[in-house]
Design a protein with these regions (language model features):
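Single conserved hydrophobic/aromatic residue that forms the stacking wall/gate
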Residues: 1-7, 12
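The substrate-binding groove and active-site-proximal loops of carbohydrate-active enzymes
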Residues: 23-40, 69-88, 121-134, 154-164, ...
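Catalytic domains of carbohydrate-active enzymes, especially glycoside hydrolases
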Residues: 38-62
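Carbohydrate-binding surfaces of carbohydrate-active enzymes
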Residues: 46, 80-81, 87, 93-106, ...
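An active-site-proximal structural segment forming one wall of the substrate-binding cleft
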Residues: 46-48, 82-100, 127-150
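Aromatic-lined carbohydrate-binding surfaces of glycoside hydrolases
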Residues: 59-73, 85, 106-120
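Substrate-binding cleft/loops of secretory-pathway carbohydrate-active enzymes
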Residues: 114-127, 146-149, 154, 158-249, ...
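Aromatic, loop-rich ligand-recognition surfaces of beta-strand-rich domains
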Residues: 298, 310-313, 345-409, 423-458
């Protein structure tokens, strides 16, 4: 999951054709009327140009409309109009992802404003199990059949409350709630059944497998542990739960043909990248298809520009031409060694570390001639946990006198990846950079002996 780093979320719905951010479940199926057959391959091609590793297709949002011909409800593409009748987004999305060698998964909303079973009570006022048994769990099982190579199934936490829906009616709306989503949706059974079908899938929103970072604005905490909750996580939490940050590339989650969709610029998206991927989180960026079932040109242009920025600013690793040393290194054992040169060998399965009990160390990278540097990236060997608590980065023009870099960036955690802008800003690119004949990375505190598998310099 964490090795994916960046992915995309694609939302096309019946609400795309009503210009509403959320539907109500009262929309007629014929409202879903794409002007041509939606093209998931184009969605993923746009994402790939921005160096994204995969995507999650929203195949059922809160309005309950299913973007595949499900057997669980008539509120699906089978009863839509025009090109919509031929739509099977899970199939086309999975096929396209495999062709493009990308990861794929599906978002399915447990809340269903179209189902008469959702929130239904019996004559004694108790919630029935009909929705979970007849609709929700079978829908998830259907989606699992689209491929055992799915990497994530995403379950939104929004549920009931003050938002009114049809719940089986096209003409009148009502408000419904449920008391406990874990029991109502039969989550333990859901987790077990889906993992039996998809052993390698990560399930978001139904347990502790991966966590929401706590906002929808594309940033995580500068301190970010892969355990615990929210933006920062917790060093002391007992279960691994990598942070996932969902964000929008436009004003809303869905395309609105009547509004300025306020497409975010590549520079804004690059800042998001630094504040998520560069802070030990994964970035899930929403790309809403338009009424033609395509990612709009205005979005595609900025995504391609983001890819260009990533190539230009983080594409040439200067560390590969450096000499790297450490003042403290664990002795080789068996066929393995833990030498500092492992940090620049390009192999994510080798790493540098210190002897047991050594929680501090100094690593230096040196060049024969000064280099122009702007970013330093560190990556822990997280197969053995996340350990580093505090570090600092310094540069030297002459290899003798060093100056601390990174501004007010909190150089605390590293995790899978930490990118430090040496000028201290994620928003402002350092045009001039800093001349450096040497870079010093001092690990000042670690939970146990620190382990790093890669250092990159850009």
């Amino acid at each position: 999951m964490q090795r994916s780093l960046v992915g995309s979320e694609m939302c096309i719905r019946d609400s795309t054709y009503t210009n509403q951010e959320w539907g109500t479940g009262m929309e007629r199926e014929t409202v879903f009327a794409p002007t041509q057959k939606p093209d998931p391959k184009q969605w993923l091609e746009v994402a790939k140009k921005a160096h994204m590793k995969g995507g999650i297709a929203v195949v059922k949002h809160h309005d309950g409309f299913c973007l595949w011909p499900t057997a669980t409800t008539e509120h699906c593409t089978r009863n839509s109009s025009g090109y919509g009748k031929d739509v099977d987004i899970p199939k086309d999305f999975a096929d396209a992802a495999r062709e493009l060698n990308m990861k794929y998964g599906f978002y399915v909303s447990p809340w269903d404003l179209s189902s008469p079973y959702w929130g239904k009570k019996d004559s004694n006022g108790n919630y029935t199990d009909e929705y979970a048994r007849l609709v929700f769990l079978p829908q998830c099982a259907e989606l699992a059949q689209y491929g055992k190579d799915q990497f994530e199934m995403w379950f939104d936490g929004a549920t009931g409350g003050d938002y009114a829906g049809g719940y089986g009616s096209y003409t009148t709306s009502e408000k419904r709630t449920i008391d406990n989503s874990q029991t109502y949706y039969d989550i333990p059974n859901l987790r077990d059944s889906i993992h039996n079908l998809l052993p390698d899938v990560v399930m978001w929103g139904v347990g502790d497998e991966v966590r929401w970072i706590g906002n929808e604005n594309g940033y995580s905490g500068q301190t970010c542990w892969s355990m615990g909750d929210g933006e920062t996580g917790s060093e002391y939490a007992w279960m691994w739960a990598a942070g996932e940050s969902d964000a929008r590339s436009t004003k809303g989650w869905f395309w609105d043909s009547n509004l300025d969709n306020e497409v975010k610029t590549a520079e804004t998206l690059f800042k998001m990248y630094l504040e998520t991927v560069g802070r030990n989180a994964t970035l899930l960026l929403n790309l809403p298809p338009n009424r033609a079932g395509l990612i709009d040109d205005s979005v595609a242009e900025q995504m391609e520009a983001l890819g260009d920025l990533l190539d230009k600013r983080l594409g040439t690793d200067l560390a590969k031409s450096a000499t790297v040393t450490a003042d403290c290194t664990r002795e080789a054992m068996g066929n393995g060694n833990y030498e500092a040169r492992n940090l620049i060998d390009g192999n994510k399965d080798t790493y540098w570390t210190t002897p047991d009990g050594s929680k501090k160390a100094v690593i230096e990278l040196k060049w024969d001639t000064p280099q122009t540097v702007r970013y330093v990236s560190l990556m822990e060997y997280i197969k053995l946990g996340q350990r580093i608590k505090k570090f600092k980065i310094e540069t030297s023009e002459d290899g003798v006198t060093f100056t601390k870099r990174g501004g007010n960036q909190a150089t605390t955690t590293v995790g899978y990846k930490r990118i430090i802008p040496l000028n201290g800003s994620t928003a402002e690119y350092s045009t001039d950079g800093y001349m450096a004949k040497a870079i010093r990375i001092t690990i000042e505190n670690s939970g146990s002996c620190p382990l790093l598998h890669t250092i990159e310099v850009f």
